[in-house]
């Protein structure tokens, strides 16, 4: 008999709506003993079967649902089916947009909670972010090897969130050759170098692909400031869009060096690209105080908020940095501003920008809205999957 997690009375509603998480407060008791990440059955207070998921005793998310089908076992065949389902959509996208790199698995939204897989050419970069994902590592890798024999698999599960579920951080090759120091990929006509082994996340922010392309419509003959530039994806896109100058700012010397290489790789005019290693908050104030002006500013900061207790502080940070950006824009200038914090709703982010405009003493029009690229889908029953939001704002 399988181990069962019994829900408290009245706490089954979210599962009946097919939300994939069970929080610790919804649990009445465990029937049997389960190891970290082990598959369990989830039942209501009367014993009615609801779902099958992975158990995580140390996490606030006590179980993550693998399946709502009682006949479905969690094995190699299960992961093979999920991967094949996900690949169908990515095949269509890759053909339509000419992609050689994309997010293959977007966690819960692809029916594989706690699992992220990005494909860069013939490298699959894997992040196992939950106890259940780690427990099923061998089955998942077996399915990947069968479906993608041409691909090497590299582990980038060096993510702090694993510690919350009692797991060590892991990184390194799983199968196949080691990724090169910098792997070239293609995106909307750009060639870009990706550092799989040491770069942020899995090496590159694939979720901003469509936003980088959209930038081009705003930048012709414009002076652009690219904040938190990382390896220069927005900068390269701005140069391809015909900007007169782009200034890329980041604290990482390594990232800025790759950004410079990306400009050269695309045979763009390096004299139009400036690379500044500095703290963005500090530099924006310096620019303001000396009267610098820009026509377009890209504001793509890292995540400011990891949990609800940090949300108010994050709101202040987003407001401050957008206020400074608005102050630096010429009349009619465009602010392309983003938040990748899942706890920051689109409505709240829009309000923060509006408040920032008031503090900056400028009027702002919202003219376009952005979200993560289509290879990062959001399943309807899991709205938390929509983590990236952005706006194009015209400053008056």
Curated annotation (Swiss-Prot):
Catalyzed reactions: cytidine(1962) in 23S rRNA + S-adenosyl-L-methionine = 5-methylcytidine(1962) in 23S rRNA + S-adenosyl-L-homocysteine + H(+)
Keyword Chaperone in record: no
Major localisation: cytoplasm
Entry keyword annotation includes Hydrolase: no
Any one Gene Ontology molecular-function term assigned to this protein's record: rRNA (cytosine) methyltransferase activity
Keywords: Cytoplasm, Methyltransferase, RNA-binding, rRNA processing, S-adenosyl-L-methionine, Transferase
Domain of life: Bacteria
Subcellular locations according to the entry: Cytoplasm
Ranges where the PUA domain occurs: 2-81
Enzyme Commission number, as recorded: 2.1.1.191
GO cellular-component term (any): cytoplasm
Cross-referenced InterPro entries: PUA, PUA-like_sf, PUA_sf, RLMI, RlmI-like_PUA, SAM-dep_methyl-trfase, SAM-dependent_MTases_sf
UniProt cross-references to Pfam families, sorted A to Z: Methyltrans_SAM (PF10672), PUA_3 (PF17785)
PANTHER family assigned: RIBOSOMAL RNA LARGE SUBUNIT METHYLTRANSFERASE, S-ADENOSYLMETHIONINE-DEPENDENT METHYLTRANSFERASE DOMAIN-CONTAINING PROTEIN
Functional description taken from the UniProt entry: Specifically methylates the cytosine at position 1962 (m5C1962) of 23S rRNA.
Protein family (similarity comment): Belongs to the methyltransferase superfamily. RlmI family.
Stated name of the protein: Ribosomal RNA large subunit methyltransferase I
Organism: Escherichia coli (strain UTI89 / UPEC)
Phylogenetic lineage: Bacteria, Pseudomonadati, Pseudomonadota, Gammaproteobacteria, Enterobacterales
Gene giving rise to this polypeptide: rlmI
């Amino acid at each position: 008999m399988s181990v069962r997690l019994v829900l408290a009375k009245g706490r089954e509603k979210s599962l009946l709506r097919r939300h994939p998480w069970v929080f610790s407060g919804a649990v009445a008791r465990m029937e049997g003993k389960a190891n970290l990440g082990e598959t369990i059955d989830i039942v209501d207070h009367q014993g009615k079967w609801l779902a099958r998921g992975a158990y995580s005793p140390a996490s606030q998310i006590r179980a993550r649902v693998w399946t709502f089908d009682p006949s479905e076992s969690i094995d190699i065949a299960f992961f093979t089916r999920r991967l094949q389902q996900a690949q169908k959509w990515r095949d269509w996208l890759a053909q339509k947009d000419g992609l050689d790199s994309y997010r293959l698995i977007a966690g819960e939204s692809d029916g594989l909670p706690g699992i992220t897989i990005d494909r860069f050419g013939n490298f699959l970069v894997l992040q196992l972010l939950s106890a259940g994902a780690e427990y099923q590592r061998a089955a998942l890798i077996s399915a990947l090897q069968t479906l993608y024999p041409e691909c090497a698999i590299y582990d980038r599960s060096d993510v702090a969130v694993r510690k919350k579920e009692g797991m060590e951080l892991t990184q390194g090759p799983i199968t196949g050759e080691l990724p090169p120091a910098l792997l070239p990929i293609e995106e909307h006509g750009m060639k870009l170098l990706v550092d799989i082994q040491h770069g942020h996340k899995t090496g590159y922010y694939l979720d901003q692909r469509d936003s980088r392309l959209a930038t081009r419509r705003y930048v012709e003959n414009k002076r652009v400031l690219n904040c938190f530039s990382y390896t220069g994806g927005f900068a390269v896109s701005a140069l391809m869009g015909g900007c007169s100058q782009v200034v890329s700012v980041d604290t990482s010397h390594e990232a800025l060096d790759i950004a410079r290489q990306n400009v050269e790789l695309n045979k763009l005019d390096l004299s139009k690209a400036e690379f500044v290693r500095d703290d963005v908050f500090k530099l924006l104030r310096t620019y303001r105080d000396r009267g610098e002006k820009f026509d377009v500013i890209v504001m793509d900061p890292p995540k400011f908020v990891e949990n609800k207790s940090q949300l108010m502080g994050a709101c202040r940070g987003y407001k401050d940095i957008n206020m400074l950006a608005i102050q630096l824009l010429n009349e009619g200038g465009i602010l392309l501003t983003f938040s990748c914090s899942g706890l920051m709703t689109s409505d709240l982010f829009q309000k923060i920008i509006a408040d920032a405009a008031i503090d900056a003493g400028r009027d702002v029009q919202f003219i376009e809205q952005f979200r993560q690229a289509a290879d990062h889908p959001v399943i309807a029953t899991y709205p938390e999957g929509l983590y990236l939001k952005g706006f194009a704002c015209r400053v008056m």
